[in-house]
Structure formats: structure tokens, C-alpha cells
Amino acid sequence: MYQKLPNATLLKSGHLSRQFRKIGIFTFHDACDFVWKLPYGRTSDKSNWLLVLSERTGTCSTKHALLKALANELSLNINLVLGIYPMKESNTPGVGTVLEKYGLEYIPEAHCYLEYKGKRVDLTRHGIRCDEEITEFFIEKNIDPDDIGEKKQGIHKNYIKKQYGIDKFKKIWAIREQCIGAL
């Protein structure tokens, strides 16, 4: 999966490189493997991607933002992408029961991943088998690691408001939160 990305030896002087080196990780690919294998879960501050290392968990946003920041430190030309996709059981196992309860086929969900030379690399959930990969996106936008908090949420909420209207927004967002809780 992460072999599609360029590799580099971590720096002795870089802040993030030092954090990874302290735990025995010395290359970008090793950092990708480590982060990919961490369990899926929100950190105590969902916009602070540095917490992935200390809390040993992360979401698509925090895991990929951390790796993008490390790539920046190593001068690797890798993009952090925010995409809005149709979240459904076949591409996000665990959400089907919630969607079925409300008679929904899908809910537009924000997803972050890395991109290199036109290839998507998703290191969110290791070992999870899906009937289909997430390949359909309504929108895709390059973002910076520090955009995974309010800016990402704003883009996501605005998309849902446009899709369903202001009147239904709160209900759809609440269903979305139930879906995330089911993961």
C-alpha cells in the first residue's frame, strides 16, 4: 500500500523525525507502516495530529496529517487530500446497520488520504476488508495537516447542507455521528 509513496531516511534534526526515531522508526515507509497498523480511533483532540504518536490511535485525518507533516519535513512531494465520498456498508464496514435504521443508502463523509503522482494511498484501517474500496468522491481538495480540524469540518458540513438543505442538516449530521461511533 504505502510502497506507492517515495521513501526516505528520517532526519536526525527534524522534530517529527526525532519523534519517530525515539520509537525505533528510521524511514518514511517504516513510519507509514507503523501509523497504518495503529488502531482506528479519535484522539483526545481530533485536530491535533501529533497525538497519534502518544495516544497510539488515529483517524483518517490525524494519521494522514501526521504522515503528510513528516513528508513535508523530508521534502517528499506527497499531498494530503480531503475527499467527500458516499459512506456505506460496502466501503466502510460497520455503518450499514445505522444507515438501514434511517433508510439511507449512504451519507456523504469526509475522508483524508495521501496522494502521490495521481495514486491514492489510504493508511486508515489496517486489516479491514471491504466489499469495495473508496474510489468514488464527490469532491477532492488538497489540504495542509493543520486544516484537519475546523476547516475540514466546515467543508464537510457545507457539503451536507448543500446536499440535504439546512432543514435536514442536524438530523443527517447526527446520523453521521452514529455511523462514526459504529466503526
PLM regions with names:
Residues 46-103:
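Active-site neighborhood of thiol-dependent amide/isopeptide-bond enzymes
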Residues 33-34, 69, 73, 116:
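Residue-level signal for well-ordered alpha-helical scaffold segments within enzymatic catalytic domains
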Residues 1-58:
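Secondary-structure boundary elements
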Residues 30, 65-66, 109:
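Short Gly/charged-rich anion-binding patches and loops
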Residues 2-4, 8, 18-23, 40, ...:
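His-Asp-centered catalytic microenvironments across diverse enzyme cores
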